[in-house]
């Protein structure tokens, strides 16, 4: 909260103090309350901070920070917000969670998948979307930068086809994955080690991942490349830097 909310408040104050021409805040699709069915679109005005609909401390902190930015925009600051979905693509030197999942699948270190879905934008498309928001984004507006949802099963199939690794055969139902995650979280509390799977990560696979990026496409010129292209390019990069054989 101190970084995502307090830090955002500090940045806004600095923008005002130094007459910054524009602020683009990078939020998250996790900050938008989930709709059970249909496509999920940007919130208008402010995000309703309903803990029943915004899951996880990170997402809640992003929602709170987004509201801080939108409030500042109403007060005259030239500021807009982008909501990226999950991020995938080459040159992830920090080895984020999605890249780590990709590497684990290729190296055979993930014995089973989960019967859920992702929504992942290519980091290069995200970068273009951020530039588009800086150039064309309207003050006080929010823009989703996502992709089409892809099932875990289809994702692993693409990884197998592009890397040559064995195709994953077993996919846990969400209910079973959630039960295992709860057990792993309890064990992690005792050992102090990070659990292999969390109830929050299971939720992110089980939730509605149909984020609508049409507003960003219309107003910012946002485009997305195929999952196959992103996965192929990331695998090439991972091989080049020695992360996979």
What are these model-predicted stretches?
Residues 2, 6-56:
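Conserved Rossmann-fold NAD(P)-dependent oxidoreductase catalytic core, especially the SDR/UDP-sugar
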Residues 10, 64, 97, 114-135, ...:
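Substrate-positioning beta->alpha
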Residues 31-33, 77-98:
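Flexible, glycine-rich beta-alpha linker
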Residues 36-45, 94-104:
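Short, flexible, mixed-charge acidic loops at enzyme active sites
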Residues 49-53, 100-121, 125:
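A conserved pocket-lining segment of Rossmann-fold NAD(P)-dependent short-chain dehydrogenase/reductase
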Residues 53-81:
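Active-site Tyr-X1-5-Lys
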Residues 129-196, 213, 218, 228, ...:
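Mid/C-terminal beta-alpha module of Rossmann-like enzyme folds, strongest
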């Amino acid at each position: 909260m101190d970084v995502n909310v307090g830090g955002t408040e500090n940045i806004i104050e600095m923008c005002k103090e130094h007459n910054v021409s524009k602020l683009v805040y990078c939020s998250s699709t996790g900050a938008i309350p989930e709709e059970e069915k249909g496509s999920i679109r940007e919130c208008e005005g402010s995000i309703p901070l309903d803990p029943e609909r915004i899951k996880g401390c990170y997402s809640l902190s992003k929602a709170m920070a987004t509201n801080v930015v939108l409030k500042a925009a109403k007060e005259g600051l030239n500021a807009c917000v982008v909501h990226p979905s999950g991020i995938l693509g080459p040159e992830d030197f920090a080895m984020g969670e999605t890249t780590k999942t990709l590497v684990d699948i290729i190296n055979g270190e993930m014995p089973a998948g989960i019967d859920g879905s992702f929504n992942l934008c290519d980091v290069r498309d995200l970068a273009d979307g951020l530039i588009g928001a800086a150039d064309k984004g309207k003050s006080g507006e929010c823009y989703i930068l996502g992709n089409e949802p892809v099932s875990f099963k289809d994702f692993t199939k693409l990884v197998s086809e592009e890397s040559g690794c064995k195709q994953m055969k077993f996919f846990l139902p969400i209910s079973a994955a959630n039960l295992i995650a709860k057990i792993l979280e309890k064990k992690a509390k005792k050992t102090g080690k990070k659990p292999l799977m969390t109830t929050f990560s299971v939720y992110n696979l089980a939730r509605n991942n149909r984020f609508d990026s049409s507003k960003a496409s219309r107003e910012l010129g946002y485009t997305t490349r195929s999952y196959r292209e992103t996965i192929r390019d990331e695998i090439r990069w991972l091989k080049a830097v020695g992360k996979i054989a």
